[in-house]
Amino acid sequence: IHYPSEPVVTIKELQAMARYAKSSEYANFRTAVRLAATGSRSPAESIMYGMFAPPLRFGAFGISSLKGGMLLNHRIDFDTTSLHMASGVPYAVCDAYIPAAHIDTEYNGVGHEKENRRIHDGQRNNGLKGMGVTVLVINRDQMRDIVALEAIARSIHKAAGGLLRYRYSGV
């Protein structure tokens, strides 16, 4: 589900609040504001960003440390070949695009299980493939599976030419 409404509080407003909150009591708040990103269109995308993007020391997989970081709802316009591969779909909006790895991580909740949605997703994924972008789909169950999330993060780091130095239960 995507929410077309404006956020209740913007990152800019949170940053202003964080500058005002100087007490050590607000250290965690200031850190959270520093790590937050704009552009999420759903709670699941925000959670996915929180699991993958922040540095390892905060319990995430450090994707934001890769060149270009992790961009939420990044638009990729298709070239002519990719447009044909996508059956006329002119562009894709990636839930979370990692430029260094040429990977789009897509959260597919229950809405993506409907037939017309699967057809559209397949077309856009073909277009992205034509642009050299690999699409990694994360479903509801995988969002709760730390071993799966680690494996996905490891593959992203590898595609970016790096190495994830993190281990959970021997993966």
Please annotate each region the language model reported.
Residues 3-171:
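Surface segments flanking catalytic/ligand-binding clefts of nucleic-acid enzymes
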